[in-house]
Design a protein with these regions (language model features):
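Bimodal "functional hotspot" detector
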Residues: 19, 26-322
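Secretory targeting and sorting signals
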Residues: 2-28
Length: 322
């Protein structure tokens, strides 16, 4: 088999995989066919999600249940500028709740969240899980009737029951209805080998103020294994966000500040690197253009282009049709 023929086969496989991923971007609940949001569509800002703090005198099972129910509001702050879900936790567990960094488990909204008491002030929570979203945003559908469970310790804080999370931390449990409100599918883009085209990898991220940061962080990661040999990234290995935030100014310019390295400053990498970031970050609501800076140096220019670029065509790139 010639190299060109092998390349065509690999590219065809990528197209099939991408198409399958695009087709699987909803969580099935019935046999009805419903119109849904397309992957990569610019999603309107979500409505604010309001949840209640713990009620005085609530028993352990109610505290555990209401903590899980507070999960969809993990990006919201109350009047005291604190995330309400944290008020269900014992002080030593606040930093163990990492909804942005650990696995999100999606459970069937038609099934019950089962909570059973255990000895030594503990409760076990069990759900019928339908999918997981890992820390990189990859969605994995689970076999039917998959059960997921965890154990929370319970302790009294100022006379009220509060949760002691597992030592390895806890992410999110969201029912299917809340998942649809909080998460959306996006494309993280990579450069097709020897071409000025980008191919997407589908990820799921929370829709909210930190979406540009989540998309940028995902773009910095290595190329997924299934795209190996077909696509590459122009972003040097080991490059990170210099600050854990991608601010968006009032004109819609998202500024990405990267850690310094010789490869990051390589002029041959700038156009494809910029193309990847533009294609990925412009999916975030309000982002119209992208500027790239290097820590300690400032904006990295590309010949004949402005400091902030808004179009792939300005860079000579395009998206692979899916």
């Amino acid at each position: 088999m010639t190299g060109r023929a092998a390349y065509r086969i690999r590219l065809g496989l990528v197209a099939l995989l991408c198409g399958a991923a695009l087709a699987a971007c909803g969580i099935p609940r019935s046999s009805d066919v419903l119109d849904g949001r397309r992957v990569g569509d610019n999603v309107a800002p979500r409505a604010r999600i309001v949840v209640n703090p713990p009620a005085v005198g609530s028993p352990p099972d109610v505290i555990a249940r209401d903590f899980i129910r507070s999960g969809p509001a993990f990006q919201e702050t109350g009047d005291d500028q604190q995330v309400v879900g944290r008020s269900y936790l014992a002080p030593g567990s606040v930093d163990l709740w990492r909804p942005n960094a650990l696995t999100t488990t999606v459970y069937d909204s038609r099934t019950l969240l089962k909570i059973e008491p255990l000895p030594s002030d503990q409760v076990r929570l069990t759900i019928t899980a339908v999918a997981t979203i890992d820390e990189t945003g990859h969605y994995r559908e689970l076999p039917p009737d998959t059960k997921a469970s965890t154990v929370f310790g319970m302790t009294k804080v100022d006379g009220e029951w509060r949760i002691k999370l597992p030592d390895d931390g806890f992410g999110l449990w969201l029912n299917t209805d809340d998942f649809d409100r909080v998460f959306a599918a996006y494309q993280v883009n990579y450069v097709l080998t020897a071409k000025k085209e980008l191919v997407p990898d589908v990820r799921w991220f929370p829709v909210g103020p930190r979406l540009p940061t989540a998309l940028a962080r995902a773009q910095l990661a290595a190329v997924p294994a299934y795209l190996g040999g077909v696509a590459d990234t122009a972003i040097p290995q080991g490059t990170r966000l210099a600050v854990d935030a991608v601010p968006v100014d009032p004109t819609g310019v998202a500024t990405i500040t990267l850690t310094n390295s010789t490869q990051t400053l390589d002029p041959t990498r700038r156009r494809p690197m910029w193309a990847q970031f533009i294609a990925t970050l412009r999916q975030a609501p309000g982002v119209t253009a992208v500027a790239i800076e290097v820590q300690g140096i400032g904006k990295i220019p590309v010949s004949s282009l402005p400091a902030a670029v808004s179009s792939l065509s300005d860079l000579g790139f395009s998206l692979t049709p899916t």
